[in-house]
């Protein structure tokens, strides 16, 4: 048999659940890279991950590394021997490095002369001799931010390692990994099945581990089982389970043998806003809440146990007992908070610092109130409501609920505002001011909320840039990248008539003399335009399309987006490549012009080609102006694409730098007008 399945399992103490999947997939990727580097062929790699183990299985791995021919070229013959024909030191040094003498070297003739060369055949090694190093290297390259030592060992890993098993077919690969000798013994579930047992063949994994050790090693299998059983439990209770992907994967990483169970809590807790209850169920307890068909929270939840007793009553009651104090706390905080109105919490914001140089949260609230009102006027929504929402925007940070359950900020402000009798749009804006919270998150639904969300984000961006604390490298303590992208998404996707430069200027004015960066407006605008690039690249739009628009630096995001869509469309046209090249040529010609360029004079035209182009660009200049005003850049570029034929004819038949100054200036005017037409949309000369 020329191939065998290879298994490596690393048995550890409990691995960090949020890192488990990344560790496992990285381990598999690293093993694959090491095998490829060694020239070892295989069919497929499978990865396994459970709380106390990482494993990789390589299917049909070649048992022998292939032999390979190597060729090492040395110095030129002219430099390898001196005038007397003796080897030079350069030649001897090269030969020594190859393990031969100069006389044993071959010669190879090239068009640059004759060279010394050493050819050799390196015999491939048995795969079993390479696997220990392959595994060690793969583990060494895992993304482990804080490795640890244990016992008296000097090795480091993310958690202490207790067992290592490496099998090529039925053969044990002897060696030491992370200070532990490879052996056939693997460990089962901590509480179920056999504690330890031997594995005889790689093909027995992972079924043997499930049968004897009560461990489902396949991460995706456990995940699918938890999902299916959770959905079934919820359906049986007349509801739908709220199963977020991130929480599902975390729960999958916490159990070796999943046992999905349902439990309940007292209905009186449903008087508390559902978001607070869900926060503690998901965040603290790793439970899946259940909602009815109308989206109302039910007094039930689903949890996943790592043990499977015949009677689960004790486990269910235990989880109900554990969650009850947390829900009681939430109930107490909610009832206590209702005793004081949001607006009455404003003075307390003066005791909390937003940023030392930028003042307190009360200062920030005052700025948001004013800027939200300005934005509301520009986008045609209720200024008074936007200002009221801005004024109350941070008051819920002073409540007991948000202090204890920080992720409920905003949503609790909404509930408290409703209780206080605030306008519904104002209340909703208190929640939606933080949207979008992450990539792909939904946007504020109302324009009032959009005004407050934008005011908050621009205040943070302007303030932090204004004191010279722009993000550096990966460090972004004020989440400015997220704020910038969120603001851009709101403006673009809601097609709001807002200008970045104008908003930053208005925001900066509200800080008084607190800002020290004189270039804050340009810095913030450039930063936000840079986030456009990342956004569009994620959408699959080519970099040169984005650069073509960035070259014009349009500061209205909705307008910027329209230009990008237009250039992206233009790039697909048959004439795009030729016109991009022509515009590049035009740019070079105009850059060398030594005098001011005037308007086109048709009476000066001599050649038919120049007259045809002049008439075409003049006609189009008139035709596209209304389209430019409407922002219909796609139609503009579609019309300009018709210039390909007259442009090609012009460059084929007309000499721009004519001896006659009037003729030369008129031809430059034609090209200048041509370039100007395209520059009203983008600089297409940068298109590749």
UniProtKB/Swiss-Prot annotation:
Catalytic activity field? tRNA(Gly) + glycine + ATP = glycyl-tRNA(Gly) + AMP + diphosphate
What InterPro entries does this protein map onto?
DALR_anticod-bd (IPR008909), Gly-tRNA-synth_bsu (IPR015944), Gly-tRNA-synth_heterodimer (IPR006194)
Per the UniProt entry, what are the Gene Ontology biological process annotations, in alphabetical order? arginyl-tRNA aminoacylation; glycyl-tRNA aminoacylation
Family annotation (SUPFAM superfamilies): HD-domain/PDEase-like
Annotated PROSITE patterns? AA_TRNA_LIGASE_II_GLYAB (PS50861)
Disulphide bridges, residue numbers = none
Task: Spell out the Pfam families in the cross-references.
Answer: DALR_1, tRNA_synt_2f
Q: Under the cellular component aspect of Gene Ontology, which terms does the record hold?
A: cytosol
An example of a GO molecular function for this protein is: arginine-tRNA ligase activity
Which EC number(s) does UniProt give?
6.1.1.14
Q: Where in the cell is it found?
A: Cytoplasm
Protein keywords: Aminoacyl-tRNA synthetase, ATP-binding, Cytoplasm, Ligase, Nucleotide-binding, Protein biosynthesis
Indicate where this protein is primarily found.
cytoplasm
Q: Is Kinase one of the keywords?
A: no
HAMAP family in the cross-refs? Gly_tRNA_synth_beta (MF_00255)
The record's note on quaternary structure and interaction partners says: Tetramer of two alpha and two beta subunits.
The family line of this record is: Belongs to the class-II aminoacyl-tRNA synthetase family.
Under what name is this protein listed? Glycine--tRNA ligase beta subunit
**Species per Swiss-Prot/TrEMBL record:** Haemophilus influenzae (strain PittGG)
Q: Lineage of the native species?
A: Bacteria, Pseudomonadati, Pseudomonadota, Gammaproteobacteria, Pasteurellales
